[in-house]
């Protein structure tokens, strides 16, 4: 098992080190999954993340700080934290310590290095992660090689691809008929004046050309069909997998980087479906060409054999040059795409703040960076093609030069020389293609790494879980809940809270107190570090996410509307919307009038993300969407912040009706007008419940809520005076 592991990007060093240590103990895991375990984000991985990831992999791990002498006593391999060039925080695997040097595995280049004591001492921060197999550790290999993945793509279509390959082989063999035809024409037909043989061979060549055309046509059709099927498998499979990934993935990955993987899927399809067939075909042509050349005249064939090592050297150099450059091309292209998507999604903000020049500069910087690496890639291609072309032309001249000498000496006939020359021309084309194939191979390999690392990530587990039905819903219990985002920001530490069924519960608190996080946890968007959240007697971990999220409807702070009409956005996910239900919900919310004033009423197209609506109208659509599903638990996260007083009154009346129907309503709000109708108010501060009671109780008790109440009351009075 390979112990050296190279990091993919600057944030990967910790995960790559952990993968290397795991490989030392015969455990192979994808680096992408270890990143997921470790909570690696745009800042990288911290020590806590490495320790927790090691635990999930079956190891016992501990982060320690030691002195220089301890470095020689600890069990190895271990992970050491260093600072490179006094700037870059980095992890390396400590392999061996001797009196003369420290041996490490550096994920920066994925290689072993022996470093002198003094040099390592300058870099080492004293921090180590000690790792050893635990009781639950098992030797296993969960990595899937690119070759196996490629075969899994090919296998369902191997019959069609084999037919295409067989047709291509026949096509290439028939192509060699031209060289035989030229030889016979010069040596037999022209000297003998055999007109009947000329006509016979001419007709045969016409038939061969027609047959080659038909073979080429059907091969192209087969490849087109197979390509579409592979595209469907890769692209749709990728999209379906994306939707099953946990929310943390989308928090840490930019949209442009996610979209760029679709381009990677196209590169993989191109390689699997077309290039691989052409590569096999070209190798076959080279073999057949050599056989024919030795058949015509072995002395000239030896000259051709001599140039094979030269072509091999060109291929090797091209491979070395392309390996690193092509990965950088894809990464910088993805970075540019991410910047473009981000800036276009924020076009309104850019205009409002006059950030056009700033945004242009950011985009231009990434574009120039991409152009620089594309230029290097282009130079590599020019070197490869020019070198191959030069060798091909020189060898052609050499063959004619030497061959003409043999023809003058009567060792070879003029027809055989021309036939040989024709085969040489047939030979040099595939050689150029094979060497050019190197870049496509690199592209496909890198694209496979980038795409399949997403497939390696663990999805939300839906197996062997309970379907939550409306009648199963009861009080909501948070029991000793401990949660943090990734391995950095702790939000809750032993949170205990009960939300009664059939009540309107308001959750108040300053920004950053954990209100919105509470909502996310209730929909099981994030995994808890410890504790339990129960609806009735059912732990959220034992419920399917689909059924949970149907029962719990949320109106979030940030509203996402889809490109479609009003009905599409209210009855989202319903292929046959219940118009009676849509109108009923809109009437309750007092929305019908404003919808009917739109150009096409309920069929009005809203534009991307509801661009044609005001903020308040968007919020009302979002509230209607949540109510359309008839949820047992409704959560409003600052959901009325953009509403006018009349619209808010309709929402409050609707919420009151839900209480009468014994539904649970949770309101996250700062505005007293929303909190005013709550049966109970919970006040959070720094992830803890600091106050819990009715509005009347909390408004007279000195504490955070009263200060907020007093502050808003003063603001209202001042506004009235003004």
Each language-model region and where it sits:
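Loop segments that connect adjacent transmembrane helices in multi-pass transporters
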Residues: 236, 240-257, 328-376, 448, ...
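Cytosolic ends of transmembrane helices, especially the final helix of ABC transmembrane type-1 domains
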Residues: 332, 336, 351-355, 379, ...
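Transmembrane helix-loop-helix hairpins at lipid-water interfaces of multipass membrane proteins
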Residues: 162-215, 222, 294-299, 410-414
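Transmembrane helices of ABC transporter permease
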Residues: 203-212, 216, 278-328, 399-412, ...
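Alpha-helical segments in transporter systems
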Residues: 159-184, 201, 205, 223-224, ...
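Cysteine-nucleophile protease catalytic domains, especially the papain-like/related folds used
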Residues: 1-74, 87-88, 98
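ABC-type nucleotide-binding domain
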Residues: 470-722
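Noncatalytic regulatory segments and standalone regulatory/sensor domains
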Residues: 15, 38-45, 51, 72-167, ...
């Amino acid at each position: 098992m390979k112990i050296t592991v190279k990091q993919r990007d600057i944030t990967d060093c910790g995960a790559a080190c952990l993968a290397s240590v795991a490989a030392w103990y015969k455990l192979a895991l994808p680096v992408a999954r270890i990143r997921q375990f470790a909570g690696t984000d745009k800042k990288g991985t911290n020590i806590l993340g490495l320790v927790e990831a090691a635990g999930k992999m079956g190891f016992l791990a501990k982060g320690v700080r030691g002195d220089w002498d301890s470095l020689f006593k600890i069990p190895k391999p271990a992970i050491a934290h260093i600072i490179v060039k006094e700037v870059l925080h980095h992890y390396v695997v400590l392999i061996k310590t001797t009196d003369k040097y420290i041996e490490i595995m550096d994920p920066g280049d994925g290689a072993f290095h022996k470093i002198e004591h003094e040099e390592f001492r300058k870099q080492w921060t004293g921090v180590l992660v000690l790792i050893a197999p635990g009781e639950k550790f098992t030797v296993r290999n969960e990595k899937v090689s690119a070759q196996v993945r490629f075969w899994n793509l090919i296998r369902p279509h191997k019959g069609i691809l084999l037919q295409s390959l067989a047709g291509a082989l026949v096509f290439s063999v028939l192509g060699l008929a031209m060289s035989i035809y030229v030889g016979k024409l010069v040596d037999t037909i022209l000297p003998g004046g055999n007109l009947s043989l000329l006509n016979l061979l001419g007709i045969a060549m016409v038939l061969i050309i027609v047959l080659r055309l038909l073979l080429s046509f059907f091969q192209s059709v087969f490849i087109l069909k197979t390509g579409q099927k592979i595209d469907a498998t890769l692209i749709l499979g990728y999209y379906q997998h994306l939707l099953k990934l946990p929310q943390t993935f989308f928090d840490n990955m930019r949209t442009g980087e996610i979209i760029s993987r679709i381009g990677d899927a196209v590169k993989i399809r191109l390689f699997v479906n077309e290039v691989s067939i052409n590569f096999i075909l070209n190798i076959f042509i080279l073999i057949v060409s050599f056989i024919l050349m030795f058949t015509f005249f072995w002395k000239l064939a030896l000259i051709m054999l001599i140039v094979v090592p030269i072509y091999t050297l060109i291929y090797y150099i091209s491979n070395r040059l392309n390996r690193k450059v092509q990965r950088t091309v894809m990464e910088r292209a993805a970075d540019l795409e991410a910047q473009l998507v981000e800036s276009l999604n924020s076009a309104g903000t850019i205009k409002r703040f006059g950030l056009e020049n700033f945004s242009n500069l950011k985009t231009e910087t990434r574009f120039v960076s991409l152009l620089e690496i594309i230029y290097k890639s282009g130079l590599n291609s020019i070197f490869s093609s020019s070198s191959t072309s030069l060798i091909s032309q020189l060898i052609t001249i050499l063959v004619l030069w030497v061959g003409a000498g043999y023809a003058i000496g009567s060792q070879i006939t003029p027809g055989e020389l021309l036939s040989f020359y024709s085969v040489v021309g047939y030979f040099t084309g595939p050689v150029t293609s094979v060497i050019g194939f190197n870049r496509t191979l690199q592209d496909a390999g890198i694209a496979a790494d980038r795409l399949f690392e997403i497939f390696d990530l663990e999805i939300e587990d839906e197996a062997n879980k309970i379907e939550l039905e409306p009648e199963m819903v009861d009080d909501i219990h948070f029991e000793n809940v401990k949660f943090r985002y990734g391995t950095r920001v702790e939000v809750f530490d032993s949170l205990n809270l009960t939300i009664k069924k059939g009540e309107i519960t308001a959750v108040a608190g300053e920004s950053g107190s954990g209100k919105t996080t509470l909502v996310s946890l209730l929909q099981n968007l994030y995994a808890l570090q410890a504790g339990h959240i129960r609806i009735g007697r059912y732990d959220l971990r034992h419920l399917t996410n689909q059924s949970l999220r149907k029962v719990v409807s949320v109106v979030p702070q940030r509203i996402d509307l889809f490109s479609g009409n009003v009905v599409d956005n209210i009855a989202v996910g319903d292929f046959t919307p219940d118009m009676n239900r849509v109108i009923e919900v809109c009437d309750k919310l007092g929305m019908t009038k404003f919808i009917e004033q739109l150009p096409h009423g309920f069929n009005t197209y809203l534009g991307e993300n509801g661009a044609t609506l005001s903020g308040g109208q968007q919020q009302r659509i979002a509230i209607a969407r949540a109510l359309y599903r008839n949820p047992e638990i409704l959560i409003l996260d600052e959901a009325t912040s953009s509403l006018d007083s009349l619209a808010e009154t309709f929402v409050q009346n609707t919420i009151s009706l839900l209480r009468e129907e014994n539904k649970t309503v949770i309101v996250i709000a700062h505005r007293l007008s929303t909190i005013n109708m709550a049966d109970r108010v919970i006040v959070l501060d720094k992830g803890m419940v600091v106050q819990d009671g009715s509005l009347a109780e909390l408004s007279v008790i000195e504490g955070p809520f009263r200060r907020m109440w007093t502050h808003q009351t003063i603001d209202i009075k001042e506004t009235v005076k003004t």
